[in-house]
Amino acid sequence: MIEEKKELKKRRVLQMARFYGAAAFTLITMRLISRAIKVRKCNVPSIFQQNYKLPPFSQRNEAMSALTYASAASIGTFSTLIFGFCWALDISTAREFVFKTREFMSLPQALETDTSMDEETSKLTKQLQDLLSSENNK
């Protein structure tokens, strides 16, 4: 029983660390986006600069920057959402996620899934397992 409590605590700490890591990534990304918007929004010329000419910029770099920021923001937001959901429902693996989802939707639980393979696939799987086990033994 004590081992189960330790394992549960370890599992919850890992879930918490994943959530807080994703949240920190999201907050840092949003801060960088805010700073990038402020820099691009206001162009105040210095004392001897012309005020009717825009500073030179590369459209390609602007597009790459926007794509990078948007991708990082969406990845951070969705990872925070997913890790928070999994932390709240105590889900650590994909198998547990499938189990909880089926339970939530009142679908019957399939204990044994159909994992039958044809001959070629089973041979290839066995060869890969042998290769990986021989690499681990070195």
Curated annotation (Swiss-Prot):
It is a multi-pass membrane protein. It is found in: Membrane. The chain crosses the membrane at residues 17-34, 67-89. One of its GO terms (cellular component) is membrane. Its main location: membrane. It comes from the Eukaryota. Keywords: Membrane, Transmembrane, Transmembrane helix. PANTHER family: ALTERED INHERITANCE OF MITOCHONDRIA PROTEIN 11 (PTHR39136:SF1). Belongs to the AIM11 family. This is Altered inheritance of mitochondria protein 11.
